[in-house]
Regions:
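S-adenosylmethionine
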Residues: 1-221
């Protein structure tokens, strides 16, 4: 209900519709992220951790192939898959880069209207789909991921225009990577304001008590 162009169904990855870019299969929660970013045609948009490209194709569609979308993936193998997906999708306004966020920030100081940081995370939300992920999880892993995510977010802030929009998302439930990272952002970048997100069925408020008690965290999803 929260993604006008999203439909439930079974998609064969080898089907003609998928191979030619008419459809792209992804989780409803992943599609929701693109709706929150809500890029507009003609804007400058950065997808900082973009591979394999599902959310990126959504951003391309919402921008109607107008403006500039920089899709970055630090790992070359992932960047190749990202480029293939964007080509299949018919993206004309996208540029694929394979840089660290720290290097990319030097090229685009305060340049983008909107930035999506779909951060690499501990992946707790994927355990139901990929049980093998449990094998590399440990009690220390969420904090390790959170430290890495903060470095990525710091770079993102250096590339965001004044008055721009930053969307931070993960596929984990760990407070260290979610509420606590948002609280870290608000503390270290006092000009940021946490904008309320309209919630749909199955979504819950952020939990201030899982971070520093900042009441604004209820605006997160």
């Amino acid at each position: 209900p929260y993604v006008p162009t999203g439909y439930y169904g079974q998609i064969n990855g080898k089907s003609l519709d998928h191979v030619t870019g008419w459809v792209y299969s992804q989780e409803p929660s992943a599609m929701f992220v693109g709706e929150v970013v809500a890029p507009q045609a003609g804007e400058r948009v950065l997808d900082l951790c973009a591979a394999p490209g599902g959310k990126t194709t959504h951003l391309v569609a919402k921008m109607a192939n107008k403006g500039l979308l920089v899709a970055n993936e630090i790992f070359p193998k992932g960047a190749k898959i990202l480029a293939e997906n964007l080509e299949r999708w018919g993206a004309k306004n996208a540029v694929v880069t394979s840089e660290s966020p720290a290097d990319l920030e030097k090229q685009f100081p305060h340049y983008f209207d909107r930035i999506l940081v779909d951060a690499p995370c501990s992946g707790e939300g994927m355990f139901r789909k990929e049980p093998a992920g449990i094998e590399y999880w440990s009690t220390d892993y969420p904090r390790e991921c959170a430290n890495r995510q903060q470095k990525i977010l710091d770079s993102a802030m250096k590339m965001l225009k004044s008055g721009g929009t930053l969307v931070y998302s993960t596929c984990t439930f760990a407070p260290e990577e979610d509420e606590q990272n948002i609280a870290w952002l608000l503390k270290n970048y006092p000009t940021l304001k946490l904008v309320p997100i309209e919630k749909s069925m199955g979504m819950d408020d952020g939990r201030p008590e899982w971070a520093d008690g900042n009441a604004d965290l209820v605006n997160a999803v």
